[in-house]
């Protein structure tokens, strides 16, 4: 069976996901077969594996860092919020249905067999399992039925690294308080604490680190700097949305829907030096972009209502009539059509039908069975501004409940309005390049002035930079002693 180490945090967004990815990369570099694991993830950012299973993207990133194929066993339970008090529950990659939060909480321990089967299966195939917790083990109201933090650590007998975020302040209180709120048994599982997202001279921290070790009775296993790496990370969501880049040669506006999903679809465009990718949630902030993207969403009808009430729908329609390129992905694609109906209330109780934006000739009906599959092929029949996509390869995955009439192929278009069910459709560098070339031609600027790069080599380099920072920040001899159960 594999050795294991678990990374827990003092709070959400403490940097667990990225630290786990970095540790996966370090251990891979050191010659180990490594797999990530997170028993339960709550996220709208998901991925479809080769066998059609759905899992959280955080574990996909960690698998990529480890150099292995993503597998639903790495994230056996995925919760995708549908409302403020309920989620779609996905177990072993397959939808089990929608469930109110309290019902899931009551039934949570029923999912332990699925969690353990997934973990034990991975543990038979790999040398080391790097486990990520969720939220904080200090949520004492959730400890009784916990299956993702200390509850999971007990089930798989995992030693724990506790991570605190110094960038938001109060890291010593975070770490000490979290340790103090654990039972004696669980405190013994904490083998090291980590100060994460540090900026500055470590020498300034040293007195506090020594006091922290004395108070907690646990060694400081590292001080990891604030990482400036370009890796898709769930913890960077609020930071990503908060960006408002200064003007660049090409301006792309992504509509920030309330229930936006798979925001990483647009990451390829962020990597061009002279492309501005903005997230917009107010009509007055839309301005006059070169391209408007309506992203995927977990609640198409509710987010279309929001789009309408906010005034953004009218602004997008006006921009489209003026020739601006408009592109919808998945739920955003459905919104662009004539009509959406949900007769069985698959999304949520409430509205069963709604008129779409009327920019594409398609009608969508939500059905009980979810489409979740990887897909690839060659573009054909693409007209208008993006006609140069014809003959070029695409790859990605589909995750949606609705079926749309008149939607054929990977890309459906009418004039300057385009839509696709394929998440990751921009990931192939040739696809992103072709779209940007078309925008440059329309605007009369040089594509070469945007700055180009090798996307695959760039991604691998980012994982190596992450590993360099994690290796330098962590006490790796201590990490290996923890893995070998020597502390």
Positions of predicted regions on the chain:
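Flexible phosphate-sensing "switch/lid" loops adjacent to ATP/NTP-binding sites
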Residues: 1-320, 325, 345, 368-369, ...
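Catalytic nucleophile serine of serine hydrolases
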Residues: 330
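A conserved active-site-flanking secondary-structure segment within enzyme catalytic domains
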Residues: 337-391
């Amino acid at each position: 069976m594999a050795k294991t180490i678990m990374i827990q945090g003092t709070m959400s967004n403490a940097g667990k996901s990225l630290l786990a990815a970095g540790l996966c990369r370090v251990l891979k570099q050191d010659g180990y077969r490594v797999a990530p694991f997170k028993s339960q993830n709550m996220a709208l950012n998901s991925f479809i594996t080769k066998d059609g299973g759905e899992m959280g993207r955080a574990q996909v990133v960690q698998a990529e860092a480890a150099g292995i194929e993503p597998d639903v066993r790495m994230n056996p339970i995925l919760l995708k919020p549908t409302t403020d008090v309920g989620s779609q529950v996905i177990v072993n990659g397959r939808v089990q249905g929608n469930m109110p939060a309290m019902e899931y909480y009551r039934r949570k321990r029923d999912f332990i067999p699925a969690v353990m089967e997934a973990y034990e299966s991975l543990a038979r195939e790999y040398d080391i399992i790097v486990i990520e917790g969720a939220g904080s083990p200090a949520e004492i109201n959730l400890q009784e039925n916990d299956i993702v933090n200390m509850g999971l650590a007990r089930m798989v007998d995992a030693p724990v690294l506790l991570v605190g975020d110094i960038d938001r302040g109060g890291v010593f209180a975070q770490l000490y308080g979290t340790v103090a709120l654990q039972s004696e048994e669980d405190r013994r599982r904490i083998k090291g604490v980590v100060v994460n997202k540090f900026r500055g001279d470590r020498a300034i921290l040293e007195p506090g680190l020594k006091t922290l070790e004395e108070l907690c009775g646990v060694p400081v296993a590292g001080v990891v700097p604030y990482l400036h790496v370009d890796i898709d990370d769930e913890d960077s969501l609020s930071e990503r949305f908060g960006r408002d880049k200064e003007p660049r040669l090409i301006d792309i506006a992504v509509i920030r829907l309330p229930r936006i999903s798979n925001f990483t679809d647009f990451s390829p465009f962020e990597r061009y030096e002279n492309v501005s990718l903005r997230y917009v949630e107010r009509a007055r902030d839309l301005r006059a972009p070169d391209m408007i993207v309506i992203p995927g969403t977990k609640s198409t009808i509710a987010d279309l209502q929001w789009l309408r009430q906010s005034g953004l729908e009218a602004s997008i329609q006006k921009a489209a009539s003026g020739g601006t390129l408009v592109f919808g992905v998945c739920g955003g694609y459905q919104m662009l059509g004539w009509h959406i109906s949900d007769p069985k209330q698959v999304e949520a109780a409430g509205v069963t039908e709604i008129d779409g934006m009327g920019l594409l000739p398609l009608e969508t009906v939500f059905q009980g069975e979810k489409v979740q599959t990887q897909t690839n092929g060659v573009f054909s029949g693409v007209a208008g501004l993006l006609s140069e996509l014809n003959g070029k390869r695409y790859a990605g995955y589909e995750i949606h409940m609705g079926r749309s009439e008149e939607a054929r192929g990977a890309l459906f278009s009418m004039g300057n309005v385009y839509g696709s069910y394929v998440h990751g459709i921009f990931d192939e560098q040739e696809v992103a390049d072709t779209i940007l070339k078309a925008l440059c031609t329309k605007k009369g600027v040089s594509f070469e002035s945007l700055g180009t790069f090798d996307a695959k080599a760039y991604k691998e380099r980012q994982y190596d930079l992450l590993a360099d920072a994690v290796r330098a920040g962590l006490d790796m001899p201590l990490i290996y002693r923890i893995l070998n159960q020597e502390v």
